[in-house]
Amino acid sequence: MIASLHRPTLAKVDLSAISENIEQVVSHIPKQVQTFAVVKANAYGHGAVEVAKHVSKQVDGFCVSNLDEALELRQAGIEQPILILGVVLPDGVPLAIQENISLTVASLEWLALAQKQGLDLIGLTCHIKVDSGMGRIGVRNLKDADNLIAGLKALGADVEGIFTHFATADEADDSKFKRQLSFFTDLVDNLTDRPRLVHASNSATSIWHAATVFNTVRLGVVIYGLNPSGSVLELPYNIQPALSLETALIHVKTLPAGQDVGYGATYTTTAEEVIGTLPIGYADGWTRDLQGFHVIVDGQLCPIVGRVSMDQITVRLPKVYPLGTPVTLMGENGGASITATEVAEKRGTINYEVLCLLSDRVPRSYD
């Protein structure tokens, strides 16, 4: 999808805020660790290449979701270690070796398939994934972990790391977290051949369970200035949202009472109202369930009225404003603010999704 450069809708990314957030989190971890910045899903909508280049001297490596995301970083000149957190099938091994990209290996079945295909794993760096209770990918017991490590090494691979992922580190009830932590700790402590890097800490763990980190952490949504729990848990220190979403009024009209607005005629004016149109819609990631939410114009919260269209939304204004008047959808404007978490709560989802859904039609600018 091509970026829509010739309209006023723009996501502004403050790269210095990301750097400061990394410094803030790392300063509160009570021991020296290796830090991997998670830049999957286009750095949670912020721009993977731009973010990686900016923080490259602050972190020890990067995590992505798949091989194509890793290749994007390599092609942009990123030379630091890159770990793919998802499973890449064995046919991707030659390219991973060629580009010095670390793979996650999550099962003995993967190893068996690599052996069946006659793959030489010399030059491959990999991390073992342990399913400690998430129920997705990973080995589920010590025997499988030992056998997987031994089998990979027998084929020439460098088994650099072992890791797990917590399902509830961002929740007030930490009982599930403690069970997963105990399972993973016991497994790692009893490995026949323990890899060099051990990591379980995502953003939430690094914030609220910093004392439990191993020797490596994966920092994701927190470096972009978002609370991993939404509003469930209070942050113990300040972080700065790195992305704001802005547009401008492209049409303003005064409608008399009784006039319908938008598809389905779901909104009808009850008195004379000033209606403004903004060039953003669900094709940009501003989804249909945001009808009834608000934007900021001139420091005032203005409700979204009528359905969100593919390319446009309509808002009720307190007065007539000139075309081109700035409008904030996320961020600060005239003393008022809207956060990604507030958008997420309106939509019944999480702040991660709000930013990840911002489409390529929305250009990003960087400060």
Swiss-Prot record:
EC class name: isomerase
Keyword Isomerase: yes
Pathway: Amino-acid biosynthesis; D-alanine biosynthesis; D-alanine from L-alanine: step 1/1
Keywords recorded for this protein, A-Z: Isomerase, Pyridoxal phosphate
Record Gene3D superfamilies: Alanine racemase (3.20.20.10), Lyase, Ornithine Decarboxylase, Chain A, domain 1 (2.40.37.10)
Active site residues per record: K40 (proton acceptor), Y263 (proton acceptor)
Coiled coil, from the record: none
GO cellular component: cytosol
PROSITE patterns in the record: ALANINE_RACEMASE
Entry-annotated residues carrying N6-(pyridoxal phosphate)lysine: K40
InterPro entries, alphabetized: Ala_racemase, Ala_racemase/Decarboxylase_C, Ala_racemase_C, Ala_racemase_N, Ala_racemase_pyridoxalP-BS, PLP-binding_barrel
UniProt cofactor(s): pyridoxal 5'-phosphate
One Pfam family of this chain: Ala_racemase_N
Catalytic activity of the protein: L-alanine = D-alanine
Swiss-Prot/TrEMBL GO biological process terms: D-alanine biosynthetic process; peptidoglycan biosynthetic process
Residues that coordinate or bind substrate: R136, M310
MF terms in GO: alanine racemase activity; pyridoxal phosphate binding
EC number: 5.1.1.1
Stated family: Belongs to the alanine racemase family.
Role summary: Catalyzes the interconversion of L-alanine and D-alanine. May also act on other amino acids.
Record protein name field: Alanine racemase
